[in-house]
């Protein structure tokens, strides 16, 4: 697992944060096959290893985490069981990728977001449909849905063929600051999980959606490994804060900048 830390507090943060780019939902159950038509599966076409998920915004655009950037990326839409493809499953590759910063810089609490333009539009179908951007931010205490093909056990990871889903809760950012230490006072992330432990996103869930009250509110970003430990919620990029940037890029303003 790749670990990324802030230079000023390198040792502490190196022990605290881990990308969820190879994680699945711990403590969940198989998602209903009709529950995730917007969910994208992201592979390295050379190694044929699954690394991340993403969310389809419209026929041409997928939103995911910046740390999901990889060589030889293939994006699968309409997938449920990886070993038994749906008839309407479609595959695309990136045509363009957009980051908040030209040097692709991001931290566990800022700008871990990537917008991908597909090489050709997908066709909507029974198992392929978009998810709109949120109209308002989520509130503390909201119950949210997580989903993905990431690890279902940790630290000895096992990976399912079908996506798993589970419910977690939004906490005040101060809960994550207390749990991890060394975090800035403000962040464009959501703090979410189950403080009792046992339920969490995990390796290879990165880039997937956090859905609160029917709205796409977060992107799976960072958390502690092993996954699903008590008192250690995870971080999700706050989609609402980046809505203007996302809409500007999709509209053709490729010079648009992310919120500071």
UniProtKB/Swiss-Prot annotation:
<feature type="glycosylation site" description="N-linked (GlcNAc...) asparagine">
    <location>
        <position position="44"/>
    </location>
</feature>
<dbReference type="GO" id="GO:0090729">
    <property type="term" value="F:toxin activity"/>
</dbReference>
<dbReference type="InterPro" id="IPR043504">
    <property type="entry name" value="Peptidase_S1_PA_chymotrypsin"/>
</dbReference>
<feature type="disulfide bond">
    <location>
        <begin position="176"/>
        <end position="191"/>
    </location>
</feature>
<dbReference type="InterPro" id="IPR018114">
    <property type="entry name" value="TRYPSIN_HIS"/>
</dbReference>
<protein>
    <recommendedName>
        <fullName>Serine protease VLSP-1</fullName>
        <ecNumber>3.4.21.-</ecNumber>
    </recommendedName>
</protein>
<dbReference type="GO" id="GO:0005576">
    <property type="term" value="C:extracellular region"/>
</dbReference>
<dbReference type="InterPro" id="IPR001314">
    <property type="entry name" value="Peptidase_S1A"/>
</dbReference>
<dbReference type="GO" id="GO:0030141">
    <property type="term" value="C:secretory granule"/>
</dbReference>
<keyword id="KW-1199">Hemostasis impairing toxin</keyword>
<keyword id="KW-0964">Secreted</keyword>
<feature type="active site" description="Charge relay system">
    <location>
        <position position="112"/>
    </location>
</feature>
<dbReference type="GO" id="GO:0006508">
    <property type="term" value="P:proteolysis"/>
</dbReference>
<feature type="active site" description="Charge relay system">
    <location>
        <position position="67"/>
    </location>
</feature>
<feature type="domain" description="Peptidase S1">
    <location>
        <begin position="25"/>
        <end position="251"/>
    </location>
</feature>
<feature type="active site" description="Charge relay system">
    <location>
        <position position="206"/>
    </location>
</feature>
<keyword id="KW-0325">Glycoprotein</keyword>
<keyword id="KW-0378">Hydrolase</keyword>
<comment type="function">
    <text>Snake venom serine protease that may act in the hemostasis system of the prey.</text>
</comment>
<feature type="disulfide bond">
    <location>
        <begin position="31"/>
        <end position="165"/>
    </location>
</feature>
<keyword id="KW-0645">Protease</keyword>
<feature type="disulfide bond">
    <location>
        <begin position="144"/>
        <end position="212"/>
    </location>
</feature>
<keyword id="KW-0720">Serine protease</keyword>
<comment type="similarity">
    <text>Belongs to the peptidase S1 family. Snake venom subfamily.</text>
</comment>
<keyword id="KW-0732">Signal</keyword>
<dbReference type="InterPro" id="IPR009003">
    <property type="entry name" value="Peptidase_S1_PA"/>
</dbReference>
<dbReference type="InterPro" id="IPR001254">
    <property type="entry name" value="Trypsin_dom"/>
</dbReference>
<feature type="glycosylation site" description="N-linked (GlcNAc...) asparagine">
    <location>
        <position position="103"/>
    </location>
</feature>
<feature type="disulfide bond">
    <location>
        <begin position="202"/>
        <end position="227"/>
    </location>
</feature>
<feature type="glycosylation site" description="N-linked (GlcNAc...) asparagine">
    <location>
        <position position="156"/>
    </location>
</feature>
<feature type="disulfide bond">
    <location>
        <begin position="52"/>
        <end position="68"/>
    </location>
</feature>
<dbReference type="Pfam" id="PF00089">
    <property type="entry name" value="Trypsin"/>
</dbReference>
<keyword id="KW-0800">Toxin</keyword>
<feature type="propeptide">
    <location>
        <begin position="19"/>
        <end position="24"/>
    </location>
</feature>
<keyword id="KW-1015">Disulfide bond</keyword>
<dbReference type="GO" id="GO:0004252">
    <property type="term" value="F:serine-type endopeptidase activity"/>
</dbReference>
<feature type="disulfide bond">
    <location>
        <begin position="100"/>
        <end position="258"/>
    </location>
</feature>
<feature type="signal peptide">
    <location>
        <begin position="1"/>
        <end position="18"/>
    </location>
</feature>
